[in-house]
Amino acid sequence: MSSIRVIAGRFGGRLLDAPRENNTRTKPMGERIRNAMFNSIGNEINGAQVLDAFAGTGAVGLEALSRGAAHVTFVERDKIAQKILSNNVSSLGVQNEAKIISAPVNSWIESGGAGKYDIIFADPPYKNPQFSTVSKLFGLLKPPTRSEERRVGKECR
């Protein structure tokens, strides 16, 4: 098992489990990218309902919780990544602030089980970027208030 760290917030510096590169299709988003993304979001994360689609190890959603999100829904279909994600949620003690959905993102959206979210993160597998599924995620955003704007972040490597 490898590890990555939570960058900032209440869990800043804590290590999260991550798979060894050869053991899974999951590759956590790099620390520099996560840091830049969360610096861009700033205080919008405070109290937010967040969706971490294609969650992998949960590094992005757990960073969101660390920085003040109220709740994160993680959606991940890979069984190895799900186990690591579940262990990471437990190790930080955020079971009441997190919900893990074990399903492909597209199937979960189409099942009607998805709610509405303030912020959505999508980091699909590089070899299967699932652009049509990512575009469906826009429909899960809560409508912004007059003073808000919505941003969408998707990492393409």
Predicted features along the sequence, with ranges:
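Class I S-adenosyl-L-methionine-dependent methyltransferase catalytic core
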Residues: M1-R151, R157
